[in-house]
Amino acid sequence: MGSTQSKHIASAIRNTDMNSDPYEWMHIRSIFPDDYFKLLKSIPLEEVQHMLVNDFNDIDVMSAVCEKFVDAPKNGDIIQSIYAFWQTHGAGYTLKPHEDGPSRIFTFTIYLPDNDDYPEAGTAVYEVNEETREYKTVGMMPYLMNSAMLICPFNKRTWHGVNMLTKPIKRDSIVLVFANHEWAEGKVHYADWKAGVNVNHVI
């Protein structure tokens, strides 16, 4: 049986509409129970990442994610690990258009703002001209309390990033990944401060 928060996460994912332009992406509101989000906000991010790995390491959560994505891998592909890492950024930060590596089956970014004053600090969805490398913002997964962005980098180009932060913001977030490789502490980039666990979920 999953925890209360895991059940809530799975339900929130299933009840969120999918966007499909220019690739599949979701912005999930109320991803946690309100009291649990308040708890996450009250403790250090280093601890939050471990808690979220446990919460998302749930069969119903993983199944809910796989069900939503047409572009998700199928037919015996395996989620072999879940890992998470925290980030804090401020004014002047930007993350240029990029694609996640092929080892990432699904990528969440859990937003942990103090308020809803800076929605533009969320994850931008880009359309990229592969020849000229010019890009434009065609969607936004806004930086709002108790929400998360979700993409499936595995089978499709998923250009995304963060537009330049120009306001005095403290942008806290947790990146949480479902990966197709085993979790081996000390052998993964930034493993000294990531939280991770091996799983075996056949898609």
What function would you assign to each model-found segment?
Residues N75-I78, P97-G101, N115:
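Short, conserved, surface-exposed binding loops centered on an aromatic residue
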Residues M1-D21, V188-I203:
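Fe(II)/2-oxoglutarate
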Residues T4-H8, A12-N75:
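Non-heme Fe(II)/2-oxoglutarate
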Residues Q49-D60, A64, Y93-L95, E134-V138, ...:
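Active-site rim elements
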Residues P102-R104, L112-I203:
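Catalytic core of Fe(II)/2-oxoglutarate
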Residues F85-D100, P153:
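Conserved short histidine dyad/triad with adjacent acidic residue
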Residues D71-F85, P119:
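A short coil-to-beta-strand element that immediately follows conserved catalytic motifs
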